[in-house]
Regions:
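C-terminal coupling/interaction segments
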Residues: 2, 266-312
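Surface-exposed charge patches
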Residues: 104, 118, 243, 276, ...
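Short, flexible cytosolic linker that couples an ABC transmembrane/permease module to its adjacent nucleotide-binding
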Residues: 2, 118, 219-222
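Short, surface-exposed acidic/glycine-rich loop or hinge patches that mediate macromolecular interfaces
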Residues: 70-73, 110, 236, 268-269, ...
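ABC transporter nucleotide-binding domains
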Residues: 7-9, 16-191, 196-210, 214-216
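Short phosphate-engaging motifs
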Residues: 23, 112, 198, 240-241, ...
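ABC transporter nucleotide-binding domain
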Residues: 175-265
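Glycine-centered loop/turn motif at secondary-structure junctions
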Residues: 110, 124, 248-249, 282
């Protein structure tokens, strides 16, 4: 996650507690400008809580956050004018049409009504006519919520589970739209989703939340490397094995997971080399194999198999 320059949003040791429940615990996260950041986590991991804090819908219990470099609350409130947010589901007027819903938003936020028609066309709702939002399908309501978030051409778009309710074609269209906004307008996008296969096709960097803690931040390239071939090693002394493997493969990453040690990226020849050296150092090798996996399997291994995320 190094080398991306300015962050549009960053936190340091951010915590959120609700009476006896800890929703976020010491989360230090960085959202780089110009990236599509995928926030991964099972239900209850803290994704929505983090996004609600970012959008000013709730306050952290403690910790520090920066929004476009602003640290104080007054400046952050001003900076949120540069954001578009879809969190907690779209807040819509059921008896108003799509166009009327956006007009209300324009009046409330001091935006130009001339943006309404192109925004509706952008999300595929330009032909809904006089149909009230209350009669929209779940997918159409998600699209209208996205249109609300896109009004004013925000620099930073925050979306909580935007794929909910969309059919496969709708998911593909949304993915292409977000890629276009990022590519052509330089829009920074933060989105959470449990449909990991879609995130894997869209995001340029990732954060993995589990039980309120940020386990890892990594780029798409780093994730692809870890989701390709890796060497799985289990010994009678994994702590010592880590030291030996890091000396053998100084350019590789060695990671402890519930299934054993993972070394990546590696080639097929690494298994034979590692086995011999580990045994020469007096370790009992219980398992050593070259494997490969996808994002869901990587995520499950990282959080210990206690995942409700979906491969899509």
């Amino acid at each position: 996650m190094e080398g991306y320059g300015e962050a549009v949003f960053a936190t340091e040791y951010l915590c959120k507690e609700y009476r006896h429940t800890v929703a976020l615990r010491d989360v230090s996260i960085t959202i780089p400008r110009g990236q599509i950041y995928g926030l991964i986590g099972e239900n209850g991991a803290g994704k929505t809580t983090l996004l609600r804090i970012l959008c000013g819908l709730t306050l952290p219990t403690r910790g520090r956050l920066l929004l476009f470099g602003a640290a104080d609350a007054a400046r952050q409130s001003e900076m949120r004018r540069r954001m578009g947010c879809l969190v907690d589901g779209p807040a819509l007027y059921a008896d108003l049409t799509a166009w009327q819903n956006l007009k209300v938003q324009c009046l409330q936020r001091g935006l130009n009504e001339a943006d309404i028609a192109p925004t509706l066309q952008l999300v595929g709702l330009k032909d809904t006519g006089s149909k009230p939002a209350g009669k929209f399908s779940l997918g159409m309501r998600q699209r209208l919520g996205l249109a609300v978030a896109l009004l004013g051409k925000p620099e930073f778009l925050v979306l909580d589970e935007p794929l909910n309710g969309l059919d496969p074609m709708g998911i593909q269209e949304l993915r292409h739209l977000l890629e276009k906004l990022n590519r052509e307008q330089g829009m920074t996008i933060l989105l959470s989703s449990h449909i990991l296969s879609e995130l894997h096709q869209l995001a340029t960097c990732y954060g993995i939340l589990h039980n309120g803690q940020l386990l890892e931040q990594l780029t798409a390239e780093e994730l692809d490397a870890r989701c390709s071939k890796y060497l799985l090693v289990r010994t009678d002394n994994d702590r010592r094995a880590v030291d030996i493997l890091r000396k053998m493969f100084p350019e590789a990453i060695c990671q402890a997971t519930v299934e054993g040690l993972r070394l990546f990226p590696v080639g097929n020849e690494a298994a034979a080399t590692a086995s011999g050296v580990l045994m020469e150092n007096g370790l009992h090798v219980q398992e050593l194999a070259v494997r490969s996996e996808g994002l869901e399997a990587y995520f499950t291994a990282l959080v210990g198999g206690d995942s409700h995320a979906d491969a899509g």
